[in-house]
Structures are given as C-alpha cells and as structure tokens.
C-alpha cells in the first residue's frame, strides 16, 4: 500500500456538512464526484472558487481535493464546501509543507473572510409555548 500524504477536514454551515480529502496529486478538485466547475447554481460557484482564487492556482498544481457534502440547502452546502477546502489546504500545508506557508494561507483566509476557517456558530432558536415559533406569539383578544 502506497502512503500518499493526505489530510481530512470538514466544514459546516447550519445542517450542511462537507468533508474534504486533500492529498498529493495533479490538481483535481471534485465535489460529490463531479468537477468543481459543475457546482450549481452558477452564482454560488464563485463562492466555492474563493479559497482557490485567494491563494492562487499555483498552490493547487500538485494537490487533489475530493469533497463530499450532505444535508442543508444549496447555499449552506456551498459555504460548507468552501470552508472544508480552505481548512484542508491549511491542514495540508501544516502537515506536509511548512509552518510559514500555513501561516500565510491562514492570514489570507482570515483577512478575506473569517468563515473560511471558523464555523458559523448560529443555530435555530427552539420553539416555545404560547406561539407558533421561537418569538412569534398567538394573537391576543381583549373582547
């Protein structure tokens, strides 16, 4: 069995979870088995490209990234994918390249958008009695 240097990271947004496998390769990036260029809708595709464009495509020349994403809606999945890719890149550079390049990547990601590396901790508020939702109340009649 050959030991290819690889790391596994995850990204989350609401109920969407993306797991990225980053390993040495020839620059392939796939999401659920299909190329990254086929991510739909097209407007959200550029959100997935953000971590790639931030650090430059030269860093991806010898790295393969496979992402599996489940749960949530389209937008949540896209945000989970981009977070998994960004975290995977940082982890790969920390483990197999050097600390300086890892710090450069981290700095670039956090200065652009903090959610590329840190998950959004907001969760839905639980429903309470006396109304239809967490804050909404049933209508009150005085007569």
Curated annotation (Swiss-Prot):
Disulfide bonds: none
GO BP of this protein: maturation of SSU-rRNA from tricistronic rRNA transcript (SSU-rRNA, 5.8S rRNA, LSU-rRNA); translation
Gene Ontology cellular-component annotations: cytosolic small ribosomal subunit; fungal biofilm matrix
Biased composition (Basic residues): 134-143
Source organism of the structure: Candida glabrata (strain ATCC 2001 / BCRC 20586 / JCM 3761 / NBRC 0622 / NRRL Y-65 / CBS 138) (Yeast)
Chain segments carrying region Disordered: 124-143
MF GO annotations: RNA binding; structural constituent of ribosome
This protein's UniProt keywords: Ribonucleoprotein, Ribosomal protein
Alphabetized InterPro entries for the sequence: Ribosomal_Su5_D2-typ_SF, Ribosomal_uS9, Ribosomal_uS9_CS, Ribsml_uS5_D2-typ_fold_subgr
PROSITE patterns membership: RIBOSOMAL_S9
Protein name: Small ribosomal subunit protein uS9
The encoding gene: RPS16
Family membership: Belongs to the universal ribosomal protein uS9 family.
Protein's UniProt keywords contain Lipid metabolism: no
Ribosomal protein keyword on record: yes
């Amino acid at each position: 069995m050959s030991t290819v240097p690889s790391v596994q990271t995850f990204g989350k947004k609401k109920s969407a979870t993306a797991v990225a496998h980053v390993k040495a390769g020839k620059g392939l990036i796939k999401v659920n088995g299909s190329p990254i260029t086929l991510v739909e809708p097209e407007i959200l595709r550029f959100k997935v490209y953000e971590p790639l464009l931030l650090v430059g495509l030269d860093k991806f020349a010898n790295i393969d990234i496979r992402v599996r994403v489940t749960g949530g809606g389209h937008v949540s999945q896209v945000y989970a994918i981009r977070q998994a890719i960004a975290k995977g890149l940082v982890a790969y550079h920390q483990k197999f390249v050097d600390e300086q390049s890892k710090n450069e990547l981290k700095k670039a990601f956090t200065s652009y958008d903090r959610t590329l590396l840190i998950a959004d901790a907001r969760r839905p508020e639980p429903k309470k009695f006396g109304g239809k939702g967490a804050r909404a109340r049933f209508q009150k009649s005085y007569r």
